[in-house]
Every structure is written in structure tokens, then in C-alpha cells.
Amino acid sequence: MSGARRCGGRTSERSSVVGDNRNGYVETDPTGRYGRLSEVLGKGAMKTVYRGFDELRGVEVAWNQATISDVLRTPDALHRMYAEVSLLADLRHDAIIAFHASWVHPSRRTFNFITELFSSGTLRSYRLRYPRVSRRAVAAWARAILRGLAYLHARGVIHRDLKCDNIFVNGHLGQVKIGDLGLAAVLRGCASARSVIGTPEFMAPEMYDECYGVGVDVYSFGMCMLEMLTNEYPYSECDNPAQIYKKVTAGKLPDAFYRLTDADARRFIGRCLVDAAHRPSAEELLLDPFLSPSQNHDDHNIIAHATAPPPPLPLACSNSSEEQEEAAPAPAAKTTDMAITGKLNKEHDTIFLKVQIGGGRNVRNIYFPFDVANDTAMEVATEMVKELDIADREPTEIAAMIEQEIVRLVPGYKQHEYSYADDNDDDDVSGHPNPFYYLSSSPTSSQGSLCGVGSTSSEGFPGPHGKVDWSRDYCYYPPSSVSVSDDDDSSTSSLSAAVSASSLHQQQQHCSASSSRLGPASASASEDGGGGHAGRPRQREGEEERRRRRMSRNRSMVDMRSQLLHRTLVEELNKRLFFNTVGAVHDIGFRDPTAAASSSSSSSHHRRRSSNKIDHKHHYMF
């Protein structure tokens, strides 16, 4: 900032054009060494970058200019601007953007500083301009960035906003350098910073806790590596910062990470994105074999779509043409696009899986729970093939996708076989499911909520990822099946479940025939007139039928708890409604004995009217 102190009095007038101006300057610095041209190289929130020229060295430079009124608009903006200049003035490294001079122009009311010029702009724009880049080149960029981070961290500096937009490229040299240190924090005797600031897509989870260290730059570097390899902005599948925040704090990586087919690249990026306690330093990452110049990094196609990509992918592609030719001489039929994603409910130890089938307008989203303790991937995959009429995928292939998602959500999960022979005590051997199961109030239950108390709205059912567009028929108990009796003499109201055993059994049979673990039957199936349909096999008798019925049961603990809670609430409500609730409320507090007799008749009439209102309200709730 010595340059700023040099500016004052008449010396500032030299900031106008000096000499004969054959270079076409718009203005010059106070010393006349640097001249600004009219060409704009970039524009940020606080500053504009112009092309400039250093007459002393005969090289082009970047002229950064900010209007003082804009800088002084907020104290934070002023602090960030001066912090960037002061840091750049103190840092000297071949991976950090070089700083030359700074000053204030009083009459123009601008703050100016000169940095080295990068001919190819930012790394992000450079990468978009040239989509095909070898892994060898990406590894060279990564080594330069890590060396710059190691230099900053050794001096107690956290960048806090490292991203490809803040990394600059000299394309003719293949050289990258770290810039834009406006958000950098200097740890002066403190091991952690305590402010939440940066770009959400590149912010480490611990930054939201407002207590972090230099490891946040390593996390951001991992996201930069992901963008360099995939040419895709991290968390581009999210629509707003709130969704990004939820994913980051939940430890969910961007979808682009799972589209990496290079196992070594995925391993290297994964090291950068682990939790802060296990995250390596920049110096440690420099020793990773992935960055070794001796490695043969000649792969141009880093990104490839696998047949069964790990979730949470929104789409998946079929096998490549080369794999199909090796598998069989005849061209293989196109497989159904399928992706399986999951969401872990840690509170209830339950996993909800989402199956996305097809693409475009024909996409189908199906949600169902997976009980880690009782379900197996192979059983669920077999049921999916039968229920969803998947003819071009093997159950083993789908089971591998399911198991891969379960392992991602529950790292310690190990696949096992479950015997349904031990479950005879839970299911009726006659084949009749528990009637209370169909009264489940859990909104996430795939079968209980379909056949339980509900509305006939065709808008769909809420799933773990939002609304499921199931505009198809499903079973429910209408409100008329719950009756309310009113006794005028006793002024009591009672609620009773007036569903007969025979009608309940018929409804259960209809529900069992039209829905399963994977959701309700399709509309086309309901029009077949009772016959079998493409998505469901014919009914089988004996042990196999009982086994299939047991498989379709939702074994999720959340459903069991919601069922018990629902039954407890119904029983408690039935008990309380047998008492004179309205009258009891009226009798609370002091009551004049002399007025009791005169108001008994009117009070009794009022209680009858109130009781009718309360009963109607309970009827509406159920």
C-alpha cells in the first residue's frame, strides 16, 4: 500500500495520460509506468479488470480498478479489497498471482492495483473452451494448485474461496496460478477461522459450523479437481443454495463424482472430500500417486457413463458399444435406463430407495423402503423385476446397484441372506395379513400408507425426494367407515371403528392385489378385468405365495412405530370420547350454586350442540 501513500497532491494528476499517448491509454498510474487500455478483461462484484501495459518491462498486465464509492458502500467490501491487495503484496510464489503496484486516484475516486495478466482467463472458461484434456495435463494443474495452497497454508493463510473461477491460466505455457484472495483469512495465532463466507458449491461442511482451518481449501481443491475432470460444476443438479447446503451438511457428494469411471481419480478426489479430521494436507496430497509425473495419464475420456452407475445419479446409460460387441456378436438390445438412489433416515435406521426408470416424459419414479436388518438386495431386485415388468435387466444386476447404494449410505453394511421361515409367527399362515397394517399412518410407507386412511387425490404421494407422480388407483378406507354416535341423554360422544371383519378382509384382498412394496399397480393393469398384467406375475399357491406376500410387507421400523402410535392414539381417543368432555370443560372453575339450577336446561342444550360440533370435528380428522 506504499503506492497509495505516494499518491497525493499534484502527483495524482500524472494519472492522466502522459507523453504522446501513442499506445492508446485511457489513463496511466501516478508514475507513468503502467497504462490502462479500454479493453475489459473481466468484471466482478467490486472491481473491473482492464488490459494494461508495463512500459518498463514491456509486458501486458492486468489493471484492476474499483470505484471508491462502491468499495466504501459496506465495511466488508472495503476490508476485502484491501485484504486482497495487502496479501498479494506479501506473497511471492510461482503458483500465486503476482502483484506489482497499487494506488488511489483522488479525482477519479478509484482504487487501482496491477497484477500479472493471464492470457487465457480463468481455468473454468479455459476448460469449457477445450473439453478434451488428458489426465496428464489435469495432474500438472493439480500439482501447481497444491503447491500454491501449501505455500499459503505455511504462512497461515486460508483462501476460503478456491474454485476454478479464481484460478487463472496462461494457455501458451500451460501455467495455472491462484488468484482472487479477497476472501482470504490470515490466522494470526489462531488455529481456526470463524466466519461463513465463500461459494456454496465449494464450501466444506465445517465452514457452516463457523470453526475451520486450512482443510477447507483442500475440500475446495477436491471440488475443483472434480470440475476439471468432469467439466461439470459441482452440485449442478441442485436448484438453489438451500439444496446445496442440505447435501453438503449431510455428507452427500455431487452427482458428477459418481460419473467418474477412473477409479484412481475417484479415489484421489475422495481423499479431499472426507471429513475434516481425516482430510490430508496439501503437502500430503502432493505425494499421492495420482499426481506422479511418471504415471501414464493418457486417458482422454475421463468421464464415461457406466451401465449401473453408483447413486445418487438422476440417470444411467446402457453398456458401451465395445462391451456389447465383446459380449455377443449380435447387437444387444437396449436396456432400460435405470437409476437407484437412496436416503438414510438415521433417526429410525431406515433407508428409502428411489428407482427412476426410463427417461424424458416416460420416466417413472418409484419409492420404497429397505430394511437393512431384514431385506436383502437380491430379494428386492427379484421383486422389482416381477412387479415392474423389467425384462431387459437381470435381478443380479439390479441387486448390485441396490447393494452399492446401501454400502454408500451405510459403510459398514454387509449383504446377507434372510430366511423367511423364521417369520411364521408374524404372518397368518392362512394368508391374511394383519388388518392393522393397512391402517399405517406413515407417509413414507409404500404399502401401509397406500391402503390406509387417506384421500383419493391423484396428485401423488410424498416420497423422500418429493412428490411421486402416481396418478393411479389405490386402496383406502373412506371416512364413512368410521362412525360417530351421539347420545343426547348422556351428552357423550363416542368414536368407533365400524368396519366389519368381512368388508375389512375384502378391502385388504383388493389392496394386496393392487399394491406392493414398490407402489400401486398401474392404471393399465387395473383395466385388465381381474386378469394378470405385464407388471405382475400370476398368483401362485402354497409356500411360494406366502413367501411373496411376506416379502411385500414393509418391515421398516418407522412403519412399526407409526402403526403402534396410530393404534395408541385411536384407543386413547375412543376412551376420552366416552366421557362428557364438553360438559367437563364447562364445569372447570368456580360456579355459583344458586345459578346452577336456573341454567341447567340451557347448559344441557348448549352441551348437545357443542357435542355435535366436536363429534363432527373428530369425524373430519379421521
Curated annotation (Swiss-Prot):
GO CC annotation terms, alphabetical: cytoplasm
Entry EC no(s): 2.7.11.1
UniProt region (Disordered), positions on chain: 1-30, 316-336, 418-439, 482-559, 594-622
Regions crossing the membrane: none
GO biological process: intracellular signal transduction
Signal peptide segment: none
Catalytic activity: L-seryl-[protein] + ATP = O-phospho-L-seryl-[protein] + ADP + H(+); L-threonyl-[protein] + ATP = O-phospho-L-threonyl-[protein] + ADP + H(+)
Biased composition (Low complexity): 491-527
One Pfam family linked to the record: Pkinase
Keywords from the UniProt entry: ATP-binding, Kinase, Nucleotide-binding, Serine/threonine-protein kinase, Transferase
SMART domains xref list: S_TKc (SM00220)
Enzyme class: transferase
Annotated Protein kinase domain residues: 35-291
Keyword ATP-binding listed: yes
Residues the entry annotates as binding ATP: 115-118, 163
Biased amino acid composition, Basic residues: 604-622
Catalytic-site annotation from UniProt: 180
GO molecular function: ATP binding; protein serine kinase activity; protein serine/threonine kinase activity
Family classification: Belongs to the protein kinase superfamily. Ser/Thr protein kinase family. WNK subfamily.
Name this protein carries in UniProt: Probable serine/threonine-protein kinase WNK7
